[in-house]
Regions:
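Acyltransferase donor/substrate-recognition loop-hinge adjacent to the catalytic core
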Residues: 2-4, 152-232
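Generic start-of-chain signal for non-secretory N-termini
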Residues: 1-32
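Short beta-strand segments
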Residues: 125, 178, 261, 276, ...
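Acyl-donor binding region in acyl/amide transferases
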Residues: 83-167, 291-367
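Short, solvent-exposed loop/turn segments at secondary-structure junctions
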Residues: 130-132, 182-184, 210, 280-282, ...
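A conserved beta-strand-loop-helix scaffold within acyl/acetyltransferase catalytic domains
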Residues: 22-64, 74-84, 206, 212-318
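Short hydrophobic/aromatic beta-strand or adjacent loop that forms the aromatic wall/cage
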Residues: 57, 172-176, 374-378
Length: 383
C-alpha cells in the first residue's frame, strides 16, 4: 500500500532533488531530451531568474513514504505581471512530472491549487513556465517522436491523467511542424523576396556578434518579440533584465549566419523582423543523459554548435512587426535562412510551437514540404 505525501521544497538540497527527478523518470527514454542541468537550476532559483522580479513560486515533491522514494514533482507559479496584463487571477503549474499513478498526479495538482487559492487565485492553468520563453504545454500528439531541448516531453500516460481528473478542460493548443529543407528556395519565397526589396525597400541584414551583443541589436530583436507576441496567449512583456539574460545565455552562443534580420531602408534601416535558428542539440543531449556539461557533454554540444554535426536545425524564434506582416518580410527571412541551411547541410528544420489559432504563421508551411507532427496542450480548471 502506497503512502503518498506532498512536501514543499524549502532548501537547495530539496531543489536538487526536484531537478534530479526528471532525469530519473526519463532515464532510458528514446524520445526525451535531457535538459541542461545548470539551465534548470538557473531558471528555478529565485536569486538567478529575473522572472522572480514579478513572479512567486513554490515547488512540491510527491514522496511514496512506503518505499521511501520521490514519485512526482510540480511547480506552482504566480506571474503577477501576466495576471495584471490579462486581468486574470491564475496560478500556473509547470515542471509537472510523475509516475503512472493517479493519486500522485492528483495530489500534486491539488497542492498547486491550494497554494494558489491561499493567494487569491481563481484558476489553475498549465503546464506553463514563469514566462512564455519557458517550456509550455503537455504533449498529446507526437509522443513517439524525438523531442527538442526547447519543449516539454512527457510519457503517454500524462494526458490520460488529465482526462481522468475531469475538472480540467483545454485552454490552448500549440502545433509543431517538421519541415524538409528544400533543395532550392521555393519560387514563392524567392519571387516575393525580390518584389518586396524593390517595392518596399526592405532588405536582409546579417550581424556580427559585436553588433548583436555590444551594439544592442540583440535587444532590438527581443523588443520586436514584445511587440510581435503581445496579443498571443498569456504573453507577458519581457523586462530589460530578462532580455539581458537571454542575450547572455543564447545570443552570445549563436552562429551569426543563422540569425537573419530584415531592415526598412525607408526608416533609417530600422530592424523590423528577424529569424533565429540553432543547430539541433537533440542527439548531443541524448548522449549526455544526466544533463551535465562535464566531463564530455560540453564537447558534444561544441561539436554541434561549431561544426554543425547534425542534419536538423531548430527555428527557435521568428518575428515581424505588425505593420510589416502584409509586406512579405517573412519571405525575406525564409529565403535567407534556407540559403544558410543549405550551406551547413541541414536537411530538416523543426519549427517551435505555434498557437493552434495562429493561422497566419501556419500558412507559411504550405509552400514547403512539411508535416504537423506534434501537438501540446495547456489545461485550465476553476479553483
Amino acid at each position: 500500500m502506497s503512502d503518498i505525501r506532498i512536501i514543499p521544497v524549502t532548501t537547495k538540497k530539496g531543489l536538487r532533488t526536484f531537478i534530479q527527478f526528471y532525469y530519473d523518470l526519463y532515464e532510458g527514454s528514446k524520445y526525451a531530451v535531457p535538459y541542461l542541468r545548470f539551465d534548470e537550476w538557473n531558471t528555478l532559483s529565485k536569486d538567478k531568474n529575473p522572472a522572480f522580479d514579478f513572479c512567486e513560486a513554490q515547488y512540491f515533491l510527491a514522496i511514496d513514504c512506503s518505499i521511501p522514494k520521490v514519485v512526482g514533482r510540480i511547480a506552482a507559479i504566480i506571474n503577477h505581471c501576466a495576471n495584471d496584463q490579462w486581468n486574470k487571477k491564475q496560478v500556473r503549474f509547470g515542471w509537472f512530472d510523475f509516475i503512472d499513478n493517479l493519486e500522485v498526479s492528483s495530489k500534486l495538482l491539488d497542492a498547486a491549487a491550494h497554494w494558489g487559492r491561499e493567494r487569491g487565485m481563481e484558476e489553475l492553468v498549465g503546464p506553463l513556465g514563469f514566462t512564455d520563453m519557458d517550456r509550455e504545454g503537455m504533449l498529446i500528439e507526437g509522443i513517439h517522436e524525438k523531442s527538442t531541448m526547447y519543449v516539454n516531453y512527457n510519457y503517454p500516460y500524462y494526458p490520460k491523467h488529465m482526462d481522468a481528473l475531469e475538472l480540467f478542460q483545454k485552454d490552448n493548443d500549440w502545433l509543431e511542424y517538421r519541415i524538409k529543407v528544400p533543395e532550392v528556395t521555393p519560387p514563392k519565397f524567392a519571387k516575393t523576396a525580390q518584389f518586396i526589396e524593390s517595392r518596399y525597400n526592405l532588405h536582409v541584414r546579417k550581424f556580427t556578434k559585436h553588433e548583436l551583443v555590444q551594439g544592442g541589436m540583440a535587444k532590438e530583436i527581443f523588443h520586436i518579440v514584445n511587440e510581435t507576441y503581445k496579443d498571443l496567449y498569456d504573453f507577458q512583456q519581457l523586462t530589460d533584465r530578462q532580455i539581458d539574460g537571454y542575450v547572455d545565455s543564447y545570443i552570445k552562443m549563436a552562429d551569426m549566419n543563422l540569425i537573419t534580420g530584415v531592415v526598412d531602408g525607408n526608416d533609417n534601416n530600422r530592424l523590423i523582423g528577424f529569424g533565429v535558428s540553432f543547430p539541433s542539440m537533440t542527439e548531443a543531449l541524448q548522449k549526455n543523459r544526466n544533463g551535465k556539461l562535464f566531463p564530455w557533454g560540453w564537447l558534444r554540444l561544441l561539436r554541434v554548435m561549431k561544426c554543425h554535426a547534425t542534419d536538423t536545425v531548430d527555428l527557435v524564434l521568428i518575428g515581424v512587426l505588425p505593420e510589416y506582416r502584409n509586406k512579405g518580410a517573412n519571405a525575406l527571412i525564409f529565403a535567407d535562412l534556407i540559403e544558410q541551411y543549405h550551406r551547413y547541410g541541414f536537411k530538416w528544420a523543426e519549427a517551435m510551437p505555434q498557437m493552434e489559432s495562429n493561422k497566419g504563421v501556419q500558412s507559411q508551411w504550405q509552400y514547403l514540404e512539411s508535416v504537423q507532427h506534434r501537438r501540446r496542450r495547456c489545461y485550465r480548471r476553476k479553483l
